[in-house]
Amino acid sequence: EQFTQVMNINTWANKVILDWLLTGNIQVKQIIAISTGTGVSTSKGWGAYSLSKLALNKLLTLYADEFPDTHFTALAPGLVDTAMQAYLCDENRVSVDDFPSIQKMRDAKETNNMPSAQDAAHAIINAVPRLMEIPSGSYTDMRNL
């Protein structure tokens, strides 16, 4: 049930929105979907989340071929200080044994390596023009721009 919920939120909800935008009478020049590094490199404990983001990445690759007038990017914002990160960094809730890569997040918490959601949003907005320079349907990471 948890796997289905993760897929519904991270993949299918995006598909519903994309289909509505792309099949309506709206000209959409650019679509940016928020992805994650775990969608391209797997790690113990991240199964459903990784698979849901991988599916989202591939959906954008497919749509880039099907809708050539729209530019698609799967964008990983990097570590962002959100409620999800707070939950994952809580040692009483999430074990490093279950999620070995979680220590990297815990080390980044409250540092410049994990900006606030507002700071991350500003960085994404500033990156929008540069995203048009990479091939449509590509995955990219904010930290590599």
Regions found by a protein language model. Give the residues of each.
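Rossmann-fold scaffold of SDR-type NAD(P)-dependent oxidoreductases
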Residues: 10, 33, 73
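Catalytic Tyr-X3-Lys loop
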Residues: 1-15, 56
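Hydrophobic positions on the long internal alpha-helix
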Residues: 13-21, 25, 59-60
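Catalytic loop of short-chain dehydrogenase/reductase
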Residues: 28-65, 76-80, 86-89
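Alpha-helical segment proximal to the catalytic Tyr-Lys
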Residues: 23, 65-66
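C-terminal helical subdomain
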Residues: 74-75, 82, 93-145
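Conserved mid-core segment of classical short-chain dehydrogenase/reductases
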Residues: 1-4, 23, 45
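Conserved internal alpha-helix within the Rossmann fold of NAD(P)-dependent oxidoreductases
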Residues: 10-18, 30, 40, 124
